[in-house]
């Protein structure tokens, strides 16, 4: 019987600009992403193009402040283990555009970007990539939901519909990104509709008595609180905004990357999880 291990990460990179001084941190981000040692990286707020930043910081002699000419997902994928990259353009403006991206060590067999924008002032999308692994297809969904709760609920329904329509029953699923779920209200809905588990909550169910009680409550259809990790703001994480949900995988480990390095790179802290399929 096969057993595939896969390491994944999700990270809102704040468009490649420092959350402290608003200066480019694209080069440092590439190095930091390499520290994940992840097979698949789910990225939000990826700058596909920004003419103003390119004009101001395009000179290579600027060192760590240099703004590479390539789109950020292409730059991150270059000369790394992530030979494959996909980008879903969501927000478009006069000087550029940004959206979600996926970096993968596995070939991307297919991709689609679903527009789930709820109003004209927030362009949001769900990037669906089908990975062709040695053990079959894996469906990956990169998510960045809106700031307003009513809109997030509609976007969550759009996510549920997208997964139901594109990921056949029995095929493994990973949903990761910035859910902006300030009040932690969406996890139960996703679990009930799609059969997914949240990475940190899944780890919690492995704890002796607590895990047994949570499992019994779920089987009895009672409400059980799902507690994702705190990731925002990165300097002192309090809000549980960033998530990794899986179906068909066992969560072996999950951690939030804390510390001064991550606080300087983005306003969100990244999550890294090790999964087992089979």
What are these regions (language model features)?
Residues 1-40, 68, 82-278:
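Active-site regions of metal-assisted phosphoester/phosphodiester hydrolases
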Residues 11, 44-47:
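Short loop/turn segments at strand-loop or loop-helix junctions that form parts
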Residues 19-23, 50-68:
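Short, flexible/disordered intra-domain loops and linkers
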Residues 46, 51, 249:
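Flexible loop residues that form catalytic
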Residues 49-52, 94-96:
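Short active-site-adjacent helix-start/loop capping segments
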Residues 61-62, 73-85:
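Charged, glycine-enriched surface loops/patches
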